[in-house]
Amino acid sequence: MNKEELYLAEDNLAAEIEEISEFVFNHAELGSEEFKSCKYLVEKLKEHGFTVTCPYLDLDTAFRAELYCGEGPKVAVLPEYDALPGYGPNKDEVAHACGHNWIAASTLGAALTLAKFKDQINGTIVVIGAPAEETTGGKCDIANRGGYDDIDAALQFHLGAENNMNIMTLAMDSIEFRFQGTASHAAAYPEKGVNA
């Protein structure tokens, strides 16, 4: 598998990827109520040979799909598919103001494209659908329940005003601080403490 083969495989899936985006767009649902979109995405993954768990971690509209391709790392893509109130044609309607229909389509598109090369990949392709990203933060719920603990790498796509390859955000980068010192009670034994 090389880049040209990947591009060709993606091109061959383009109509299906657009169909995914249109379905999710046309069935805009609020967070934790994405039953139609969740079911559609799950069925699409099953059609391509993925084994699916839904609901996932007791979250009704979360799912986890896997395609085992041999020993190796587990690499996940993370679709979002909830919508927001007040952005539809009428101000009280639900719509995809943040492009979650596109996020769902692009992440599934990446997984389905890689699935075409399952005999050439070592590892597992994982798709973890996170509900309620605009409200309660479905990815946080999944993380707090251990849903990413066995994942070696996770990829997320999002719309923006420009095409960027290198972006630093606090949510995507981590910084670790280590403080060294000696703890003591500030009132009883302040002289025994060493500030970090």
What are these model-derived regions, one by one?
Residues 2-97, 101-122:
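Acidic/His- and Gly-rich active-site-bordering loop/insert found
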Residues 61-64, 84-97, 101-102, 119-196:
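Histidine/acidic-residue-rich, glycine-tolerant segments that coordinate divalent metal ions
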